[in-house]
UniProtKB/Swiss-Prot annotation:
Subunit structure: Part of the 50S ribosomal subunit. Forms a cluster with proteins L3 and L19. In the 70S ribosome, L14 and L19 interact and together make contacts with the 16S rRNA in bridges B5 and B8.
Organism name: Dehalococcoides mccartyi (strain ATCC BAA-2100 / JCM 16839 / KCTC 5957 / BAV1)
GO function term, MF aspect, one: structural constituent of ribosome
Stretches of the chain forming a coiled coil according to its record: none
GO cellular component: cytosolic large ribosomal subunit
One BP term from GO: translation
Keyword DNA damage set for record: no
Taxon lineage: Bacteria, Bacillati, Chloroflexota, Dehalococcoidia, Dehalococcoidales
Protein name: Large ribosomal subunit protein uL14
InterPro entries referenced in this protein's UniProt entry, alphabetically: Ribosomal_uL14, Ribosomal_uL14_bac-type, Ribosomal_uL14_CS, Ribosomal_uL14_sf
Family: Belongs to the universal ribosomal protein uL14 family.
Length: 122
């Protein structure tokens, strides 16, 4: 689960490397974000020629979490790291490539562009 102050890897080619969650969107008292939830985050580490510079506030969707979570069919899935993809104002991915696997739950949340760019969908 991702909550305030959680640091996540960035799974796209915007140039940002690490982000820190500031807030979880989607409810007045929503504390934890799961796969497919949108968060507000601050870019903590980026490459010098990045689209998302260090210190900027961005919106991102969580694509991988380390905590095991149950699917409706009864199976469990977990990933090796917490990762997110940075979004633009239209809730589309800002980058043109996605690195690493992403969860199938993004399809239910209408992030089909991320699924089409991802090399593997679990």
């Amino acid at each position: 689960m991702v909550q305030q102050y959680t640091r996540l890897n960035v799974a796209d080619n915007t140039g940002a490397k690490k982000i820190m969650c500031i807030n979880v969107l989607g409810g007045s008292h929503k504390i934890q974000a799961k796969v497919g939830d949108v968060i507000v985050a601050a870019v903590k580490k980026s490459s010098p020629d990045a689209q998302a510079k260090s210190g900027t506030v961005v919106k991102a969707v969580v694509v991988r979490i380390t905590k095991p979570y149950a699917r409706p069919d009864g199976s469990y899935i977990k990933f090796d790291d917490n990762a997110a993809v940075i979004l633009n104002d239209k809730m589309e991915p800002k980058g043109t490539r996605i690195f690493g696997p992403v969860a199938r739950e993004l399809r239910d949340k209408k992030f089909t562009k991320i699924l089409s760019l991802a090399p593997e969908v679990l």
